[in-house]
Amino acid sequence: MRRVVITGTGMVSPLGCGTEVSWARLLTGDNAARKVTEFEVEDLPAKIACRIPFGDGSDGTFNADDWMEPKEQRKVDPFIVYAMAAADMALADAGWKPESDEDQISTGVLIGSGIGGLEGIVDAGYTLRDKGPRRISPFFIPGRLINLAAGQVSIRHKLRGPNHSVVTACSTGAHAIGDASRLIALGDADVMVAGGTESPICRISLAGFAACKALSTQHNDNPEKASRPYDADRDGFVMGEGAGIVVLEELEHARARGAKIYAEVIGYGLSGDAFHITAPSEDGEGAYRCMQMALKRAGVTAADIDYINAHGTSTMADTIELGAVERLVGDSASRISMSSTKSAIGHLLGAAGAVEAIFSALAIRDNIAPPTLNLDNPSVETKIDLVPHVARKREINVALSNSFGFGGTNASLILRRYTGH
């Protein structure tokens, strides 16, 4: 099958607008968790989140007007705006602007979201109740449908190849990249714009995830300490928002136009737990099989893995994932670094896997493992380096990125340094 590489990245994250800004702040140990002030939270169990830094567009802040006209913004949910911004960045970074029929038809889009326009749906419900059906906007449906993130990107950039979307909870971003890679490998496209996007931070979302016992509620007075994967004092994840988009390209297509290459996508695994609607299987079997499949597809062994970007949500599932990883890597555990970047940016739900895949590609590029913040008191002993507190310089040629979601849906991506052959 054809080989697939990453030639462009774009990101809107709680650490900033832009891949390099977010990456630099991640490596220096910045933490995006804050008390929510944009709406009332005093009656909510979870009062904190990792919000995008909004501003005038300078110093890494996000200004939606830079990416979409205000009139158009009012027609869509923010998750679509974030996707548009990240896709614009990724395509510009890749230097890919298809203009011929051939190039447009061979370029597709696959962008997913875990929740989509949740707040917009709630608001429309109030409008219907209080003002009647005639006050519902004609843009209500197309502004909230999850596949419209891909649709809007496709329309803006005239990308006429596969136009697809996935919805697999917190595995969405990883599944989008994995599925898009397969479309290229199978010859259905030469280039794919792929990733995940999410704008979930609103009252009903915080209330709902807290009701599932998924969110941190014990660190409302000290938000930066709330997301603490693998730590004994963890009590749930901190919700985040944003988008991560990559440009995936068939290797020879990228080489022919002299594109820079971040990494090669060599493995993709997916599995189901068939266990519980929110909890992972306690033996980690689904996660293990998912990673094992990715290794098989990649044609590498566990001993080849240098860095793992863990799903690591700061929940009870952390130790289950760690156990599955230890089972996978066996005697190679002591040479592997594994960190959870959710400790800095929170859990971006459907965007998480895509943002973390980008971080994994950058870890390969720069030979550095980003840190796991707040790992003060590890809950279990392991030979794996969990990269506590401070980023670690080390050789990284192969990286594994894990994403696991509600409903027992699992995805693993394996990236490798591209060396020119």
From Swiss-Prot:
Kindly list the biological process annotations in GO that this record carries. Answer: fatty acid biosynthetic process
Pathway-wise, it operates in: Lipid metabolism; fatty acid biosynthesis
Which parts of the sequence belong to the Ketosynthase family 3 (KS3) domain? 1-417
Keyword presence, Translocase: no
Q: Which domain of life is it from?
A: Bacteria
* SMART domains the UniProt entry points to: PKS_KS (SM00825)
| Active site (UniProt) | 170 (for beta-ketoacyl synthase activity), 311 (for beta-ketoacyl synthase activity), 347 (for beta-ketoacyl synthase activity)
EC number(s)? 2.3.1.179
Q: Which UniProt keywords apply?
A: Acyltransferase, Fatty acid biosynthesis, Fatty acid metabolism, Lipid biosynthesis, Lipid metabolism, Transferase
Catalyzed reaction equations: a fatty acyl-[ACP] + malonyl-[ACP] + H(+) = a 3-oxoacyl-[ACP] + holo-[ACP] + CO2; (9Z)-hexadecenoyl-[ACP] + malonyl-[ACP] + H(+) = 3-oxo-(11Z)-octadecenoyl-[ACP] + holo-[ACP] + CO2
Gene3D superfamilies from the entry? 3.40.47.10
Q: Name one GO molecular function term.
A: 3-oxoacyl-[acyl-carrier-protein] synthase activity
PROSITE patterns, alphabetized: KS3_1, KS3_2
- Give the protein's biological function: Involved in the type II fatty acid elongation cycle. Catalyzes the elongation of a wide range of acyl-ACP by the addition of two carbons from malonyl-ACP to an acyl acceptor. Can efficiently catalyze the conversion of palmitoleoyl-ACP (cis-hexadec-9-enoyl-ACP) to cis-vaccenoyl-ACP (cis-octadec-11-enoyl-ACP), an essential step in the thermal regulation of fatty acid composition.
| Similarity annotation | Belongs to the thiolase-like superfamily. Beta-ketoacyl-ACP synthases family.
Q: What is this protein called?
A: 3-oxoacyl-[acyl-carrier-protein] synthase 2
